[in-house]
Amino acid sequence: MEKTPTQIVSELCSRLLQLSRPNKDSLVKLLREVANTLSKIDQPSATNKEKGLKLIEAELRPLKKSIIKHALLKNRDNDVSLLVTVCVSELFRILAPHLPFEDEYLRDIFTLFIAEFSELSDTVSPYFSKRAKILETVSRLKFCLLMLDEDCQDLVHEMFNMFFSLVREHHQQSLINQKSMKTQQRKANTQQTQHSLFNNILAIMSDVLEEEANSSFVVVILENLVKEGEDTTSGADKLASSLIERCADRLEPLICSFLTSCFMEKDSIQTNLKDSYHEIIFKISLIAPQMLLAVIPKLTQELLTDQVDVRIKALNLAGRIFAQPKHCLSSYVETYQDLYAEFLRRFSDKSAEVRMAALKCGKQCYFANPSGNKASGVLTAIQERLLDFDDRVRTQALIVACDIMKFNMKYVPLNLISEASERLRDKKISVRKKALQKLTEVYQDYCDKCSEGDMTITDNFEQIPCKILLLCCEKNCEEFRSQNLELVLSDDLFPRLLPVEERMRHWVQCFAIMNHIHLKSLNSILSQKRRLQNELRHCLTLWRKAKVDNIEEAQRKKKSYFVKLSACFPDASEAEDLFEKLDRMRDASIFDVLTLLLEELSSTNAQIIKEKFLKMIGVKHSLFEFLRILSTKCSPSIFSSEHVQCLLNQLCGSTSANTQLKAPSIKLLLVILNMFPSYLRGSEKQFLKLLEENDSAADELIVVLSKAAPYISVNFGDYYPVLEKVCLEGTRSQTKCAVSAISSLAGSSEKSVFSELCEMLMDSLLCGRNIPTTLQSLACVGQYSVLEYDNIYEDITSYIYRVFQAEPSDNQLPCDQSSGCCNSCKLKIYGLKTLVKSFLPRHGQVVRKIDDLLNILKKTLKSQGHDGIKSCEDTGANVRLAAAKAVLLLSRKWDLHISPEVFRLTILMAKDSNAFITKTFLTKLYKLLTEHMIPSRYACAFSFSLSSPCRDLHDDSFRYINGFINKATRESRTCRDLDQGESLTDSPVYMTVFLIHVLAHDPEFPSEDCRDEHIYARFCGPLFSVLQVLLSINNNGFTIKETAPFLFCIFRAIKRAEDAVDSRKTPRLHILADIGYSAVNILNSIVVTSPQAPRSILLPSSLYSLTSITDNQNKAKSRTRNALEQSFIERIVHIFQSQISMHDQRCQKDSLAVGSEDKVLPPLLGNQIETSITGSTEASQNNTRCSRKRTHLGEHISCNSLSLRTVESEIPIKKLERHTTCAKESVKASVSNKITSSKHSGVVSALKDISNHGEAIIGQRIKLLSPTDGCFYPGTVEKFNSKSNSHKIIFDNGDVELVCLDSESWETLSHESMGQQERLGKETESYGSRNCVPEISHTLAKVTAQKQTTTTKQQNKKVPAKLNPPAVPCFMMSAKSKKGNSDSGEGSVSEVTDTSDNIGPRRSRRQRIS
C-alpha cells in the first residue's frame, strides 16, 4: 500500500531525530525531501477539518521535534536555513489556524522568515522562486499579524525597511503584466492566478497597517515616498504610494498630523522629513488627494507669508499640484479653489523672484490642462506679466508665453501673441534679444503648421516679422542694426526647407498689415544688402586685377572697399580685419564662389552653392563663420527671382486667390524690384501682362521697368505702345515714369522714338486733349532728350505764354475743391513746371537762355495781373507758390542767373497771407535744403514764418530752422576737422547776410523819420527770431562762443558795405546791422571771446559792394544823419526781449517748456505785440575795453558760387558814446563822426623789441595795440614783476591789467603825442566804437573789472593786407596794414573785408586787477 505524504514526512523526520549530529549533506538531503513532500499535503476538508488537523499534526510532530532538537531555526547555513524556512512555512500553511510551534519559538521563526525575505533582491538566484513562495504563504496566512500579537514590533519595522529596500520597479511591472494576463485568461484558468512579489509585499504591509498603524510606520513610509537615490530601479516610492492609497483611511490622521507639525512646529520635528514635507504633499496629492483636505489651508497660508523663499517653495508645490491631470482633483475642486485663487495672486507678488516662479508653474499647469477651466486664468496672469516693471519677469513671461504658443498654437489666445510680440519693443535690450530669439522659433513652427495644412495664415502671427523689422529703428543697440536683422530674415525667420511659394504667402500677408515704418526698415535692410553686393563686385574685380598688377593704388582701393564692406557686418572692426586676412589668403576658389553667388538670381541654386562651399572649406577653417555670413549676404537669401516669378504668377493667374491681397502683392513686388531690378529677369512676359492690367499701380510698375531695363531682355516694340498710351492718356505721375522707362528701354536704334513722341504730344497739346498730362510728358521729354525738345521749344513756350496771358473766367469754379485752385491757375502751374523741368535735364546740356523763364517767374511772384500775367484773385497764391518752388528747383543749376529781386520775392513767400501756401512752401524748402539740392542762403526764409502769429507755422519753422542749423553745423565742423578749410559762408550764421538784404528791400521798411520802436520791433521780427535761434545755448550747432563773434563780423562787414542793387537802400542795411549788433549783445547773456572769430568775411557781390575811399568819406556824414540813436535801438531790442520773457513765463505756467530745445520764439510780425515801455531802457550789457586777442585770417572761400568783387576802402563809422545814468533816467547816446586818416601816426606802428626793458619804463606813458579791433589804448606803467616778467598797466579809462609786454604791440608816448593818442582812443574809426572805447564812470568801470576773468595770452599774428585770389572772384574789404599803407581796391581781383573792429563786449586775455 502506498504511503501518504504525511507518513513519508513522519518517517523522514523520525530518521532525522535518530541522528545525534547530522552533517550538512545528510541534513540538506532529508530536509529537501521533507519540503517537497510537505508541498503535496493539503488541509483537510471543511466538513471534518478539526479532526483532520489533529491527525495531521500528530503525524508531523516528528518534524517539529527534529527542528527543535537540532536547533535548525538558528542554523547559519544558507541552504539549511532556506529548507527549514520552507518546511516551517508549509507547517503553518497545513496546520492553520493552529500554530505548529509554541510561543517561545515564534520569534526565531519570525527572524528566519525575515532573513529569507532579505534575499528576495537576488532575482537571479535559483532559490528565488522558493523564497517568493514563502512570501506568498506568509501573505496569505497574514502571518505578520502574529508578529504584532507577539509584540515583535522591532521585527515588523525591520521587515518594513527590508521590503522597501528590496522592492524594484519590475516587481510592480510584473503585477501589471499579471493583471493583463488575468484579463485574457480569466475563463481558462482562474484558480491558478498567482500574486506577484510586489503584491504580496504590499499585502503583508497593508495587513500590518490595518491592524496597527502608528507614527513610526508613517515615518518609514513617507521617507521611502520621497526617497531619492542613484538606484533608478528601486520601487520603494511606488510601494509607499501603493500603501498610502490602500490604507488611506488608517494613515490619514497620522499623515495630516505630521504635515501639520511641519507647517506649524517645524523645528520640533526630529526627522529629516521636515524639509521634505512639500514633496510629501505633492506625492500624496497624486494618489490620495482627499487626505490633504486638512492640510491645504496651511499651504495657502504659506503663500501669504513674508519670507520670499517660503512663498516660492509653496508656490512651486501649488503649481505642481495644479499641473496634475484634471481628473485627479475633479472631486475636490471646491477644497482646492482657495489655493488656486491664491496661486494666481502670486503672479502679481511684490517679489520678482516669486513672480518668476509663478510663471514657471503657470506654464506647467497650462501644459497639463490646456483646455481646462483653470487654463484661461493662467493665460491671463501670464499675459499681464509681459508688462511687468521688472525686466527679468518680462523675460520669463516671454519665454513661457512662447512655449505655450508652440505647445498649443492653434488655440492660443490672440492677445497673448500680440503682447508677446510687443516685447520686441521693450525698453530693455536683454528682453528684446530674448524676444527675437523666442518669437522667431514660434514663427518657424507657425510656418510649418501652415505649410502642413494644420493652420491658416493669421494676422496675429504675421505681426511677428513686422515687429522684428521695427528693431531697425533702435539706435541704442548694435545687435538690432540692419546688419544683424538681415541674417535674421535670411536664416532664422523661416524654416530652412520651407518652399518659396509658402514664404511668399507669408510675406504677402505681412505686407497687408505693414505700415510705412515697417517698409522703411525693410528697405534699409535690403538697401544695405544691395550696397554690400555692389561693393563686393568691385572688390572682386580688384582682387583679380591685383593678381597681375598689385600696385599701391590697388591696395588703397582695397582698403576703401574693406571699410565699406565691413560696415555691413555686425562687428565692423572685426570684419575689416577678416577681409584683410582673406585678401592675404589669395584663395581663388573662394573668390569664384562669391562671384557665383553674386550672379545667381535663384535662392534655391544659391543655397546649394553656399552649402557646397561651406562644406568645402570645412568648419575648422579660420574664416568659416565670416565666410558663412558673407556668403549669406551676397546671395539672394531674403528675396530672389523665384519670389518675383511666384508673385507675378499669382497676380496674372486667372484664379487669383484673394483680391484683397492683390494690393499688398504688388507692393511687395515693387519693394523687391526697386532694390533688385535684376530679379525681373525671366519674368518679362508676366510683368508686361501685369502692366497692361493694373492702372492703379502703373506708375510704380513703370518706374520698376525703367530700373530693370539694363538687366532684362525685352522687345521694345512690345512695351512701347503701353508706355506711349500712358504718355498721352495717363496721369501726370504715370507720365513721368513712362518717359523714364522709354528712355531706359530704347536702344540706340530706337532713339528716334522721342521725335515721334514729341510730334504726337504737340498735336495733343494744340488740340487741347488731356493738357496736364501732355505738358508733363513734354517736360519729361525735355529732361531725357534735350535736342528733340529744342526743336519744339518755341512752340511750347508760345503756348504757355498764351496761357499766362489768358483772362480767367468770372464764373469758373474750382475743379479741385480740396486745393481750391481753378482750371486756369492749374494750367499756369503746369506750364511753369514744364518750362522749369526743361532747364533741368537728366541727360545732356541746355544751351537755351533762361532769362525769359526767370522774367516770367519774377512777374508771377510780384503780383497778379502784372505785365500781362492774369490770375484769379482767390487762387493766384497757388501760382505764386508754384513760381517760388520753380525758383528753388532752378537754383540747383542756375543760381548765378537768379537776380536779387527774384531771390527776395521767393524768400517772401514765407510770409504769404495764405497759411497753407506758406506751410507748403516751407516744407518744400526744408526738403530741398536737407537734401543739399539748393544753396543754403534760401534758409533765411524760415525767419519770416518763425515770427509769424500763426502757431502752427511758427512751430514748423522752428523745427525746420533748428534741423537745418544742426545739420549745417555738423557738416561745417566735419570739413574743419578734416582740414578742408574753414569758411564762414559754410556756417548757418551766414544766412543773416541775405536776411538783412531782403529786409532792407522790403517795402514795409519803416520810413526815415519813423521813431516808433514798436514798428521797428515788428518789422525786425525775422532778424530777432533767427538771432535768438542762432544764439541758443543748447543748440546742437555752434555754441555762443562761436556764433556771437561771427555775427559781429557779419554786422561789421555790412556796415562797411553798400547795397549793390540800390545804393539808396544802404542806410537801411546799416540800420539793420546796428539793430542786429545790439540784439546779439542783449540776447547773448554770456560775454565771450572766440579764438576762431574771423577778421574778414566774404559778402556776395550781387548784393553788397564798396566804393572808393573818397566816396565813402563824402557819404559818411549823410549816412550818419539817417542812423538811429543807440538808445532807440536798445528800446527796439528790449521789446523783443520782453516778448521772449513773457512767452517763457507762459510756457512755464502751461508746463510746455520741457527744455531749451523746445522753446519757441514769440510771434513778432503779427499785431499781437503788447509792450509798454515807460521811461527809457537801460543798457543790457556793460561796456569793457576791446579784447586784444589776435585772430588768424582764414582761407578765402567763395559763398555759394556767388560772383563776388573786391573794393578796398576804409569807411568812416559813427561813434556812439554811452553814458551811465541812474535807473530812472533815460539812456542818451551822442553820435559823432570822425574821419581818421590812413596815415594817422598813432593807429599803426612797427613792433618794438622790448625783451630787456624791465623796470626802466615804470612811470612812462605807453599805448597798447588791441589785435581784435586795431585800436591803441593809452595808459601808465605802474610797476614791474620780475618773476612773471609782467608790467602793471593803469589805462586811462580806469582798467588795470598785468601785461607781458614781450608778447604785445606797444609804443611809448611822447609828451607831444599824448593828447593825440588819447583822442585816438576815444575816436576810433571802427564800427561799434561805442564798445571799443567805452567812456563810463569810475563806478561802472570798477564793477566791470570785477566781472573779468583771468585768461591765457596768445601770440600776435600778422594779418596780410592782401591775399591771393580764390577760385571764384570774390568781393572783400581790407583794413589798413600795420604800416599804414592802404591800397586802392579798384584793380584788385580778391580782397578781404577786415572786421577786426570789435563791436562786442571785450574781454582781455591779460590778468585784470580789481
Swiss-Prot record:
HEAT repeats lie at residues 3-40, 58-97, 104-141, 154-193, 196-234, 290-327, 334-371, 373-410, 411-448, 488-528, 588-625, 663-700, 714-751, 752-790, 848-885, 916-953, 1121-1154, 1155-1192. A motif (Nuclear localization signal 2) lies at residues 847-854. It is found in: Nucleus. Gene3D superfamilies: 2.30.30.140, Leucine-rich Repeat Variant. Its main location: nucleus. Disruption phenotype: Weak impact on meiosis such as formation of some chromosome bridges at late anaphase I and telophase I in forming pollen, but severe effects on development, fertility, somatic homologous recombination (HR) and DNA repair, especially in plants lacking PDS5A, PDS5B, PDS5C, PDS5D and PDS5E. Altered two-dimensional leaf shape leading to compact rosettes and roundish leaves due to lower cell number in both the lamina and the petiole explaining the macroscopic reduction in lamina and petiole length. The keyword Repeat applies. GO terms for biological process: cell division; DNA recombination; DNA repair; homologous recombination; leaf morphogenesis; mitotic sister chromatid cohesion; proximal/distal pattern formation. Residues 1348-1410 are annotated as: Disordered. A motif (Nuclear localization signal 1) lies at residues 543-550. GO terms for cellular component: nucleus. Keywords: Cell cycle, Cell division, Developmental protein, DNA damage, DNA repair, Mitosis, Nucleus, Repeat. Residues 1382-1398 have a biased composition (Polar residues). PANTHER family: ANDROGEN INDUCED INHIBITOR OF PROLIFERATION AS3 / PDS5-RELATED, SISTER CHROMATID COHESION PROTEIN PDS5 HOMOLOG B. Belongs to the PDS5 family. This is Sister chromatid cohesion protein PDS5 homolog B. It comes from Arabidopsis thaliana (Mouse-ear cress).
